[in-house]
């Protein structure tokens, strides 16, 4: 396939992280390509056939016959649709990786929990020291960076977002679907299009493949009902026929037709909240489905470290604990964080709009021990209004920015309280990314 690419008229649409990695891959294999980007790039690549930079970079795409879309460029962009209708092939870094990869791939998707589950799954698979494990995708590095290192007996674990999945015509050999709720409605046309993008991870699987689904999620279950693949499952509430689940204070697992095995007590899982117990069950199910033995799983789980910006304990100051959950950019993620604490909470929430509704968040705040809601960003007034509707308007404090929200939280907090940054919103506006927002919170707390 690589040889045939040398005869194509290729353009990279957007030179972000993924397409930059793809450009280096093309350069290494002497494949000519052009770059189209809205930005005036300060450090352009060498050896590019043509540069098309500026606001009109998506014009005249039919000059090419193969386009590699950056994940941030929706497939429903009118210029992309026009090019496709005129016979131009639309691809992506993820798609070409799956086409070229000689090793079996486990793809992991869901609305939240992908990063934690991906890293934990990689940790469990790595207990088999006879096999090399590679991971990347939406977390870590673009997998095209390690494609030339792969051998057929390696294993690959990829975190895949809806942006990366939406136009795939090939599914990974193993697919793991976590909870699917609602996200990125600022990007997708509607909820149905978002769900359809997620479904692509399993759409093209065959009877030789494996699909692992969240038994507690009706949407994931509906994907399984239509799949020809062998079905595995995980659950935070009930036993499964083949996979892993939570029951009686333990994490359990079994293969089809075998007795259930207790992997470890829940107290050994170093992650907060029932949603993270489900993530651990998902990782165990994926590890077993990928052929790993469960004996060393308990030790690997006990030693697992929480990822940054995911209910990350920052510090304790004057009897007050501070947690950074900046990755919680959806309502459901923020609710899961709130429900993971028994202590009184001072919640910092808000940010840029993702067209979310906040009624469920306000209900969760009202039902749990949230003493104050420090609200920031574009969505602060809407969250405050939602709290007013459930009779909790008095706990809302609209703050100018994150530093002022933290200052207010410190003023209101008492010994034994928890100050939790769990925004339920995107970071854009005040910050470039959820990482920058979380890093700012950490710096403010520890200063």
What residue ranges belong to the model's regions?
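Phosphate-binding loop of NTP-binding sites
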Residues: 59-62, 71-215, 219-228, 411, ...
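N-terminal leader/targeting and accessory segments in enzymes
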Residues: 1-92, 96
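Residue-level signal for inorganic ion chemistry
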Residues: 26, 67, 108, 138, ...
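Short internal beta-strands
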Residues: 32-38, 211-215, 348-349, 369-378
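Extended acidic/charged loop-beta regions that coordinate divalent cations
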Residues: 37, 55-59, 150-187, 221-266, ...
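C-terminal helical cap/extension that packs against the catalytic core
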Residues: 45, 50, 359-417
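Beta-strand->loop->alpha-helix junctions that form or flank phosphate-binding loops
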Residues: 37, 54-55, 91-96, 136, ...
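Nucleotide phosphate-binding/pyrophosphate-handling subdomain across enzymes
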Residues: 3-9, 21-29, 264-370
């Amino acid at each position: 396939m690589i040889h045939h690419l040398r005869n194509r008229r290729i353009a990279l649409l957007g030179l972000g992280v993924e397409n930059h990695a793809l450009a280096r891959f093309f350069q290494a294999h002497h494949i000519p390509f052009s770059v189209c980007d809205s930005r005036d790039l300060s450090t352009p690549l060498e050896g590019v056939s043509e540069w098309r930079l500026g606001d009109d970079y998506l014009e005249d795409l039919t000059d090419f016959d193969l386009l590699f879309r950056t994940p941030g460029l929706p497939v429903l962009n009118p210029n992309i649709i026009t090019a496709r209708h005129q016979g131009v092939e639309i691809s992506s870094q993820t798609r070409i990786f799956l086409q070229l990869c000689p090793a079996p791939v486990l793809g992991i998707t869901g609305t939240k929990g992908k990063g934690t589950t991906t890293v934990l799954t990689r940790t469990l698979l790595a207990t088999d020291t006879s096999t090399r494990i590679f991971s990347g995708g939406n977390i870590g590095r673009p997998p095209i960076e390690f494609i030339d290192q792969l051998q057929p007996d390696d294993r690959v674990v990829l975190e895949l977002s809806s942006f990366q999945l939406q136009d795939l015509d090939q599914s990974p050999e193993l697919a793991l679907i976590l909870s699917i709720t609602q996200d990125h409605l600022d990007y997708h046309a509607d909820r149905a299009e978002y769900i359809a993008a997620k479904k692509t991870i399993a759409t093209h699987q065959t009877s030789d493949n494996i699909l692992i689904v969240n038994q507690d999620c009706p949407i994931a279950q509906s994907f399984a009902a239509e799949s020809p693949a062998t079905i595995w499952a995980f659950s935070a509430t009930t036993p499964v026929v083949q996979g892993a689940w939570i029951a009686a204070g333990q994490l359990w697992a079994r293969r089809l037709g075998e007795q259930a095995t207790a992997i470890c007590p829940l107290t050994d899982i170093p992650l907060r909240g029932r949603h993270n117990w489900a993530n651990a069950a998902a990782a165990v199910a994926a590890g077993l489905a990928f052929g790993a033995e469960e004996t060393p799983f308990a030790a690997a789980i006990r030693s697992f470290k929480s990822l940054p910006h995911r209910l990350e304990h920052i510090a304790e100051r004057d009897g007050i604990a501070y947690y950074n959950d900046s990755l919680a950019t959806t309502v459901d993620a923020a609710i899961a964080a709130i429900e993971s604490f028994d202590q009184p909470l001072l919640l910092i929430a808000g940010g840029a709009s993702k067209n979310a509704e906040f009624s469920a968040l306000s209900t969760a705040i009202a039902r749990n021990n949230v003493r104050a809601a420090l609200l920031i960003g574009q969505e602060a007034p809407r969250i405050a209004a939602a709290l007013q509707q459930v009779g909790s308007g008095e706990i809302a404090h609209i703050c100018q920015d994150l530093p002022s929200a933290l200052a207010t939280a410190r003023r209101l907090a008492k010994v034994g309280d928890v100050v939790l940054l769990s925004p339920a919103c995107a970071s854009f506006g005040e910050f470039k990314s959820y990482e920058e927002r979380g890093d700012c919170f950490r710096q403010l707390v520890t200063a």
